[in-house]
Amino acid sequence: MESDFYYIELFEIYKGLLTETQRETFYSHYFLDLSLAEIAEQQKSSRQSVFDAVKKVKSKLTEYEKELKIKATESEILSIAESVSDKALKERLKSAVGK
């Protein structure tokens, strides 16, 4: 099972591919640290439906990464950047992935 931090990183990359409701639910739970019950109350739904929605978002994020590999590619570029001795090239590589 992946860590919450991993899913937060994937969310930052792929949030544009999610519906507004999916984005809001995930954001409320992981960024605003609201409990599933609190989100359910706001959305006038059940805690179980919010749990299922968060689980579905995590599944979609995993699926997107499996197909598109943006995070994996970013990690590989950063790894290469760390092994490069040319300072200018290192900075260009880091800049290319927004770091």
Go through the PLM ranges and name each one.
Residues E20-L32:
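Short amphipathic alpha helix immediately N-terminal
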Residues F26, I39-A40, V50:
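Hydrophobic positions on the alpha-helical face of helix-turn-helix-like DNA-binding modules
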Residues S46-Y64:
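DNA-recognition helix of helix-turn-helix
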